[in-house]
Swiss-Prot record:
This is ATP synthase epsilon chain. GO terms for molecular function: ATP binding; proton-transporting ATP synthase activity, rotational mechanism. GO terms for cellular component: plasma membrane; proton-transporting ATP synthase complex. SUPFAM superfamilies: Epsilon subunit of F1F0-ATP synthase N-terminal domain. It comes from Rhodospirillum centenum (strain ATCC 51521 / SW). It is a peripheral membrane protein. The gene is atpC.
Length: 146
């Protein structure tokens, strides 16, 4: 068994990560799952959350990336995440929380005013993603304060 697997993170805009890693932990729809070299093949839905990338070993996180959801394909040598939106956690933590709260308020109003199910679902997806960002920032601030 190889000691590394290839990890790729792709958003609609660009390829964000393509590197060999020791392990990645992905927020799946049914909970977090870790991927090591030799993992059984699977395709899963990714929920909004943080991907932890372990570059050199399985004990030290080398990079943390927020994803807004998507899909992951896992093989024995590769983990590819197709994310609807992704950003480094450090960049996300610098976000203006007041602006995010305003977006949430506006999205809730837009959902109430939506004229079709398609429009409503798209707005609800944006609301879930924006709320996940705000919750993540709050939890990181709470952890730093403790």
């Amino acid at each position: 068994m190889a000691d590394k697997l290839e990890f790729e993170l792709v958003s609609p805009e660009k390829l964000l990560v393509s590197q060999p890693v020791a392990m990645v932990v992905v927020p799946g729809a049914d909970g977090l799952f870790g991927v090591l070299p030799g993992h059984a093949p699977m395709i899963v839905t990714v929920r909004p959350g943080i991907i932890d990338v372990y570059g050199d070993n399985q004990t030290t996180v080398s990079r943390r990336i927020f994803v807004a959801g998507g899909f992951a394909e896992v093989t024995d040598t590769r983990c590819t995440v197709l994310a609807e939106e992704a950003s480094d956690l450090d960049a996300l933590l610098k976000s203006d929380t007041a602006a995010l709260e305003k977006q949430i308020s506006d999205l809730r109003e837009d959902i109430e005013d939506a004229t079709s199910d398609v429009e409503r679902r798209a707005l609800e997806t944006r609301l879930v993603t924006t709320q996940a960002k705000l919750d993540l920032i709050a939890s990181q601030q709470d952890a730093e304060a403790a």
